[in-house]
Structure formats: C-alpha cells, structure tokens
Amino acid sequence: MKSYRIYLLFLLLAAFSLYGCKKTDSGSGDFDVQFAVPESVTISGDAGTFKFRVLFGKSPLSTDKVIFGDPSGQLNTCDIVSVSSSEFTVSLYKGMVSGQYNVYIRRGNLKKLVGKMKVTIDHSGGSTDIIVNPEAGSTVYGVVVCNGKRISNAVVSDGVEVVKTDENGIYQLKSGKKHKYVFISVPSGYEVMSEGILPKLHRQLVKAPAVPERVDFALQEAPGQDNHTMLVFGDIHLARRTGDQRQFRDFTNDVNDYVTANSGKKIYGITLGDMTWDLYWYSNSYALDDYLKDANAINGLQIFHTIGNHDHDMMYAGDFETVTKYKKIIAPTYYSFNIGKVHYVVLDDIECKNTGKGDADSRYYNESLVQEQIDWLSKDLAFVPKTSTVVVTMHAPLFKDNGNLSAGNGSSLVDMLKQYSQAHVFTGHTHKVYNVDKLASDNIFEHNAGAICATWWWTSYLTPGIHIGQDGAPGGYTIVNVDGDKFKWQFKATGKPVDFQFRTYDRNTMSFTAAKYVPDASDAYKNQFLLYASDYVTTSTSNEVYMNVWNYDPSWKIEVTENGNPLKVTPMRANDPLHLVSYTAKRLNKNAKPSFATRDTRHFFKVKASSPSTTLNIKVTDRFGNIYKEDMARPKEFSTDIYK
C-alpha cells in the first residue's frame, strides 16, 4: 500500500486561510478534472495545506472545491489555493482527524467522487513556534526537532557545506544554493518522515541564492537501530519493456514477504542506482515517477536511493543538469545518514559527458568521483569518529573483480575510508556478483551486489522461470544484518530460499551445437554462438562437474566428496551455460545481437569425478559458517526446466 508521509512546515508560513467546514449535499455529476488520490497519507498536525498531483494535465479551476467526507459522514469543503498543470494545493479544514476519507471535487452544483484516502494526523511535534533568525551571511537556516525537543549535533548540508546544529537544535548554512536543496544527515536513533518508500531527508530551496530561507527538519524516534537489517538492491532498470513490471512484482512480493517474516526487526532498504533506463523515459514514457509508483508496492520500508548512469537525463549536455529531475523527485545525488552505530554515505560516481542530443549514441560518462564530491565527503566524515563503521554505496564499482582500482578518484575514497575501523562499499552497474576483500590492508570490503533485473529482465522474458545475470548469478538482493559494528550478509535470489547459493552442472551431459540451440540463425550468428559456447560445443567424457558459487569470497570453503573421498576443487573462469541457452542463444537464433551476452566469471569451480554416475556430496560454507549443500545425483541432465 502506498504511504505518503508529508511534513509541510514551511508552508505554514504562507498566508493561506483555512476555509470553514460546512455540510455539503451537492448533486453529483462529471467534469474533466483528474488527479491522484493516494491510498494512505500521513499529514503533520501543524500542516495547513495538502498537495494533489494532477493527471493528464486535467487540472481543476481555482474556483473548484475539494470536499473531504470524514469518518463521521460530515462533508468538509476546502478551498483550492494554487493550481498548476502538474499539481494543486488545498487548504485543510480545522480539526481534521485521522480516518478514512472520501475525496470529492466540486464545480458549482456538480460533485464527483475521485477516490478514497486513509489519513493519519501526526502530532509528533513541530517547530513553527521556535523563533530562529538567520545569522550574518547565513542563507539557509532552521531547527531540527523531535516531539517538540530540539536536537543538537545533527548534521545538515547543502551538498557543499556541512554544519551541525547547536545546543538549541539550530543550524546556520552560508550556502550558495548550488544544488537548490538542503538535507539532513539523519542522526542515529531517529528517522525522517516517509513519502511512500522515500525517506524525506531533503528539502528544495526556492529563494534566490542571497536571500535567507528557513527550512526545518522534524524527526521521529527510532529505538533499536543498533540491531538492524539493510536490504541492498542492485540495478532495477524498469522501462516498460520485456515484461519488466510484471517481473518486478515478483521482487516486491519477495521483499514484502521478507519484511513480514522479520517484522520485529528494524529493516531498511537502499538501491545501488539504475532504477530506471533513461533512453526509455521518452520512448516508452517510463521515468522516475513511474518507477516510484511500481516500487511503492513495497510495504513498510524506507528505501534510500543511489543514482546510476541510467537515472541521468540524457536530453541535457554535461553533468549538472542531467540530475535535476532526480534531485527533485528522488533524493540528493550524494548525502549521508546514520542508523545505529553505522554511518551510511551515498555517492554519485557517474560523471556525465552528454552532448545533449537525446539519443543513445550521445550518452557518455566517466565512472569517477568528482573532486567537489570528495571535498564534501571530507567535510561529512569530519563529524564521524574514526572508531565508526562506514558504509558507502555508489553505482559503478570501486574495484574491479581482480582487486585493482576501477573508479576514477577512487584512491581518494580509499584513503579516507581506511582511516575507519571498517568500511563496506556496495556497488552495482556490472550486473554481476563479486566481492573484493581488502579488510586486512585497507579496512575495506566491496560488495558488487548483482542486479534485481539480472539480464535487464531478458532471461525470464525469453525463458520463463530463469532469471539470471550474465555471470549466471540469479536476480536478487543482499541481506545485510548489522549488530552494532558486526556485519553479516547473504545474497537472496528473488523467489528462492536464502540457502540457494550455488548451481551445479554436469559437463558430461552438455553439448551445445548450433543445430540444437540456434537452428534458425544465419551462418554468421551461428558462428557467434559457437564462440560464446566454445567450452561446451563437444560432448565430454571428463567426468567434470562445474559449480557456480556467485557470492563466493576467499573466506568461503567448497568441499566435494565422492563415495566419502574428497575431490580437489579447482577455480576456473567460465561462461555460465544456463545463461548461454536462456538468453544469448535465443537472441542469436533470431539473428539479433545479444546486447547483454554471457560473460565469463571468477566464481566458477570444478572437480573431476572418477565415474560419470557417482553421486557427489557438495558442501559450501560461507564466511559466517552458513552451510549450503547439494547431493548431486549423476548423470545430471542439462535443461532449463531443471533449473527453474
């Protein structure tokens, strides 16, 4: 269910008078006004107004009225105080209470029901009674409160400057308002209000750079954060194509099931970027707003967001203007927050070099942390004790899977993070799963955490029941359990139990011929298939078994026995055969380029058995002692059906 939590403290300064309530018994009728009525909203008890989103450009007239039919049956008529093509604002009536409301629009004697809305009135505290004056040179200022209590030492930033609230909960920023927003680094033990899945930790700035403006932040208490779970969501790539929205519902259902099963624990979520696909913002009319509609199927979960390269607007040249929509709709492109004993930092390591032509060929970017962001991070971390644990999320990887630095300016990030007791870096972008453990040398562990969409939603679209990435890892997410400063994590495949951690293949039963897998392809595409499938084109009598252990790191242990005798486990690089036949072959068979073709991976292993028909006992133990097993009866058939 959608849940909008709205804190409109700054609107209270506007001179909007509240319209009186009266019994309304108008006739019913129809006229062309359309707007979205959220299923559920939370409104501050101090809020004097509420905004509705206009649909299809069908705005009301300023003389129309909005009527709230309250739980007692009373019809309460409210003025419309401002209207645009995208939204309109109404004055809320005095004495509004929590409950289920029918929402009507009225024009003259015509009235029509638009929707039903559950309203929760939040009286957790406000700050409009606190007098705050800007200091000399301050252009953004305000107070941070919770339940009427002023919160000191809360960190606030405009993306350039970083300050803390004083003993009275007041902050003062000498801001140039470059990013046109201000955000709070949510302090430990607190949360901000939510609007659906979005934690509303930033506010838009509306006045000229030199004109002081007040922005307050209201927090709510969140006890028990020291023991919390963070669900980490890699690339999503919703674009209204390849059945992605239907498949995405499988993911949202999976997350809802997990949250329900662990209802006694503090759980949050965070994305790793590429929630959308910029090319299809325009060609398929699916953009950031549409993503939020689909993602709001997730219940009771605040989801922080990281920006990816495909969340930039390619219709603009350069970098700065490409993120304007993202900053207004989703979140700042970089910011921080605290949960329990962990300081979380969200970074943007995509530096766009767009030409602004608006086509795929004009889309250029560097995977790099620009210096301005490094400077901001240095200021942010100055308030974080070196004994703390820091978690960083960004879209493109910090390290390659061989451990070498990948991100531009990555050495600056490493130099800052290694000063802390430990740092975990979660990244996406590759649609692969791999880990880089540098805890011993630099106090850093990077998790390149795969993709919700796996192969951009293609494998399940072409081969229903198979949802895997180019490295054979399933589409899914990472469950990070935090107990104080102790971290444990597991990869969770969508729709699978959490103990599904590897897949096995019997090499003896695989023979990937062009005649079998790409019979309709041209000779050129058949030859391409044979290149991708070169390890599997001939029947083998080697008695080898391959294992794809996607979340493997060097602290894992893989043991295989045959008739009680241990077999030598050998690392290898290989193309995942299931991905070959469920995606690459099916594209080639249609004489189409496999844009997301199978890629070899480092998380493959093999053993050599003594016989083609013995059962192998496979035991995989992760770094935390969790054990995953398969008793592999052989010969094991290779077909997509057995892996569904």
Predicted regions span which residues?
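Immunoglobulin-like IPT/TIG beta-sandwich domains and homologous Ig-like subdomains
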Residues: 29-113, 159-161
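A short, solvent-exposed loop/turn motif at the edges and junctions
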Residues: 88, 109-110, 158, 179-205
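Short, acidic Ser/Thr/Gly-rich low-complexity loop/linker segments typical of extracellular
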Residues: 157-175
